[in-house]
A protein has these predicted regions:
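Noncatalytic, solvent-exposed loop/strand surfaces
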Residues: 1-169
Length: 169
């Protein structure tokens, strides 16, 4: 599994103008978590170079700033979720994913929770990667930086509530 997809690999088209060939970072930013029973490793991926300017790497830049589940024995990607499209703010995932067993609507669920620098907690089914609660793609302001094209939307989890205040005062 390549955290920056190479030519012909899934997600390479999200790195426009061949930027996958010369962009760096997009590494495992912090500690991974593993589920021995499922044979899966959950990897919190960092921000690509340059953290605050993406004009040289247009596109959503999959798998940057994503939680990626891979098979422990092969490294094959099983599922992923990108928490920031075309990161411009150094919002890489700051902590190891937390493996939790929860009950949702009366049914037990193996889940993985991933916190973000924005104060969000994203919660997914550990096996399928499906969000436990809806995650909305919301419109966000465009960039005014010359050469930069920010993503028109970003994902916002609806539950649990953010653990940090949202907005600018």
């Amino acid at each position: 599994f390549h955290t920056i997809p190479q030519a012909g690999e899934y997600g390479n088209e999200t790195w426009e103008n061949g930027s996958s060939e010369y962009t760096g970072n997009t590494n495992s930013w912090t500690i991974m978590s593993a589920d021995d029973e499922l044979g899966l490793v959950y990897i919190p991926i960092g921000t690509p170079t340059n953290d605050w300017y993406g004009g040289k790497r247009l596109g959503d830049n999959l798998f940057a700033e994503s939680l990626v589940a891979v098979r422990a024995d092969t490294g094959e990607r099983v599922w992923h979720f990108q928490t920031v499209h075309h990161g411009l703010w150094d919002y890489d995932l700051p902590a190891a994913p937390t493996l939790v067993d929860i009950t949702v609507d009366g049914r037990p669920l193996k889940a993985v929770a991933q916190i973000s620098k924005q104060g969000f907690t994203y919660v997914f089914d550990r096996i399928t990667g499906e969000p436990v609660w809806p995650i909305e793609e919301r419109a966000v302001p465009p960039s005014s930086v010359p050469g930069e094209v920010a993503s028109p939307t970003q994902p916002f989890p609806t539950k649990p509530a953010p653990f940090e205040p949202q907005g600018i005062s």
